[in-house]
């Protein structure tokens, strides 16, 4: 079996809340599987750091360390309900790191075998974490003539599926459960916390988080402006592909999930600016991943070009521990980007390109 596109969609994990009494009453959360827990309502006020009122929704406080746990949980549970996964199935997925870790967590919890097809840009810590969880890692090194390393990863996944019908490819790039996970969880949580929201900044990778949030706000809160944050060198919004070294946001193949009619603006961020933003946040005690650095950088630049005050939220997809050997390593940064890597640099704000 190669691809799983289940029609039924999940309602997401639910934690069990119980009250215990010992001298005073306390509320605790009890779970039996790692995918049941996700810190949904944690925001950081970044005004003191960025100079603009910007609230950062932290999505990395779960057992997978990133927003990808939501999509992974939704896709696996839907495939189970639709009978696409059996005890003999082998999950396989192309991932630059975060979804691979999330699927590794779920596979370990449920007893599935999992093969993550990644490439040389995947951080070592992410690979080691997946292996610690019992997953197999296949690393693609040669880019495909069309689609680059992502295209090569997908080709490898298809070859595995063709070789053994036990493989089940959830296909995060086209699976509707990817964006519906955020339509049902992430977006409503933001709407509840910020009923007067003006603008939402969302990073664009597979575009699952982007499309789930964009579709929700279009349907229920049309006034909210959706600004997609992409990385320079990504082809997602029609730009010419170029070298990208930081895994996470950006693609070399336009994601099938993307519908640009739901996107109001696009900000493209240079990787140098991503690195500078990560370091700036770290100087204030917040160590975030490259995807979060890109989102905060793009949001800050967009806000700097607006004179009127707005209520703005940005989604932080990940934390920074998996980037300690890259984004936060001086030698790595200087080898790839030069000695002036921490000098300020502007980013471009554009309308969506179809």
Predicted regions and their residues:
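PLP-dependent amino-acid enzyme catalytic core
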Residues: 1-354
């Amino acid at each position: 079996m190669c691809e799983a596109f289940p029609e039924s969609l999940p309602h997401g994990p639910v934690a069990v809340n119980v009250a215990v009494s010992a001298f005073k009453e306390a509320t605790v959360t009890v779970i039996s599987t790692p995918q049941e827990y996700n810190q949904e309502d944690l925001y950081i006020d970044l005004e003191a750091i960025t100079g603009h009122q910007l609230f950062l929704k932290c999505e990395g406080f779960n057992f997978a360390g990133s927003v990808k746990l939501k999509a992974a949980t939704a896709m696996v549970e839907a495939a189970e309900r639709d009978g696409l996964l059996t005890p003999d199935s082998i999950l396989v997925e192309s991932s630059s790191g975060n979804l691979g870790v999330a699927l590794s967590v779920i596979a370990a919890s449920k007893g599935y075998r999992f093969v993550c097809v990644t490439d040389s840009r995947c951080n070592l810590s992410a690979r080691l974490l997946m292996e610690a969880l019992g997953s197999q890692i296949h690393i693609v090194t040669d880019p495909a003539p069309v689609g680059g390393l992502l295209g090569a990863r997908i080709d490898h996944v298809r070859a595995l599926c063709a070789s053994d019908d036990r493989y089940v490819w959830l296909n995060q790039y086209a699976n509707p459960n990817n964006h519906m996970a955020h339509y049902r969880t992430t977006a409503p949580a933001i709407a509840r916390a910020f009923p007067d929201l003006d603008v939402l900044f969302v990073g664009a990778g597979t575009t699952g988080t982007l499309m789930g949030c964009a579709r929700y706000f279009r349907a229920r809160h049309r006034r909210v402006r959706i600004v997609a944050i992409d990385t320079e060198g990504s082809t997602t919004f029609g730009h010419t592909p170029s070298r990208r070294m930081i895994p996470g946001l950006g693609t070399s193949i336009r994601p099938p999930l993307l519908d640009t009619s739901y996107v109001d603006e696009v900000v493209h961020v240079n990787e140098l600016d991503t690195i500078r933003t990560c370091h700036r946040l770290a100087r204030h005690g917040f160590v975030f991943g490259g995807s979060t650095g890109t989102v905060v950088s793009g949001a800050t630049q967009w806000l700097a070009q607006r004179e009127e005050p707005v209520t703005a939220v940005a989604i932080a997809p990940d934390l920074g521990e998996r980037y300690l050997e890259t984004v936060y390593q001086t030698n790595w940064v200087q080898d790839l980007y030069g000695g002036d890597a921490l000098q300020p640099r502007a980013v471009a704000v554009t309308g969506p390109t179809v």
